Amino acid sequence: MSLYPSLEDLKVDKVIQAQTAYSANPASQAFVLVDASAALPPDGNLYPKLYPELSQYMGLSLNEAEICESMPMVSGAPAQGQLVARPSSVNYMVAPVTGNDAGIRRAEIKQGIREVILCKDQDGKIGLRLKSIDNGIFVQLVQANSPASLVGLRFGDQVLQINGENCAGWSSDKAHKVLKQAFGEKITMTIRDRPFERTVTMHKDSSGHVGFIFKSGKITSIVKDSSAARNGLLTDHHICEINGQNVIGLKDAQIADILSTAGTVVTITIMPTFIFEHIIKRMAPSIMKSLMDHTIPEV
């Protein structure tokens, strides 16, 4: 089954397929598009879960009942008429409209655990501040153009291991001490990406808009029949990135400027407000506004 970064890409590819099939065998039956409202599969859920399962994060207990109450968009089938998008590898996407867009590559989410290797800069630093929360070590700050920024570490990521040592139960001081004493040429970190993120790729209309309104970084409404609506953007979600560029901690005017200067294809990374606000509450929000990395990552 083909995967697409946006609904526009899917529709154009369907037309291309139909034209190709007709050209190859014009006498054959007409190409029929299957109605998206087809019957649900036996499990009653047309869509897989949008987000990975997670029982604990920064002291937040996320059992099924609490997820249903606080984030109804996460569990079960979507309401009638609600559109859904889910993150997937850009390497396997069919994108006749979007093309090889750099924003999609920068914004790609790799759910699960990953390993990064970084080295210290000329000052012996990696540009990373960690914080101990409920026996876990989390990324509190990534500085611009630092080694930590270059390997893709993000605010809210959990550090599971440093150079093969489990970080569970460490204090913030111990984590920083281990990094300070580590060999500068190679530091290996095992990372669990911040949870419940997803990306949505949209296309600007003739007026340069994708069709959503936000306040304090939170998506508050979706414009009917816009690209945002067609591609499953949801309200009550916070914008974390635009085309892979971190916008957490920026003012609305700054976020609007980034959106307006983006190309015709815009990929945003969002997180349920319930989770986002919990992370911010535990992470000292004043640091975000003054020191956090907001540069455009390289791909």
From Swiss-Prot:
Q: Where is this motif: LYPX(n)L motif 3?
A: 50-54
Q: Which GO terms describe its biological process?
A: negative regulation of receptor internalization; negative regulation of transcription by RNA polymerase II; positive regulation of cell growth; positive regulation of cell migration; positive regulation of cell population proliferation; positive regulation of epithelial to mesenchymal transition; positive regulation of exosomal secretion; positive regulation of extracellular exosome assembly
UniProt superkingdom? Eukaryota
So where does a 1,2-diacyl-sn-glycero-3-phospho-(1D-myo-inositol-4,5-bisphosphate) get bound? 251-252
UniProt's post-translational modification comment states: Phosphorylated on tyrosine residues.
Q: Where is this region: Interaction with PDCD6IP?
A: 2-103
Which SMART domains would you find in this protein's record? PDZ
User: Domain PDZ: where?
Assistant: 115-194, 199-273
Q: Which residues carry this modification: Phosphotyrosine?
A: 47
What function does this protein fulfil?
Answer: Multifunctional adapter protein involved in diverse array of functions including trafficking of transmembrane proteins, neuro and immunomodulation, exosome biogenesis, and tumorigenesis. Positively regulates TGFB1-mediated SMAD2/3 activation and TGFB1-induced epithelial-to-mesenchymal transition (EMT) and cell migration in various cell types. May increase TGFB1 signaling by enhancing cell-surface expression of TGFR1 by preventing the interaction between TGFR1 and CAV1 and subsequent CAV1-dependent internalization and degradation of TGFR1.
Q: Does the keyword Zinc-finger apply?
A: no
The gene designation is Sdcbp
Per UniProt, subcellular location reads as: Cell junction, Focal adhesion; Cell junction, Adherens junction; Cell membrane; Endoplasmic reticulum membrane
Name this protein carries in UniProt: Syntenin-1
Motif placement: LYPX(n)L motif 1: 3-7
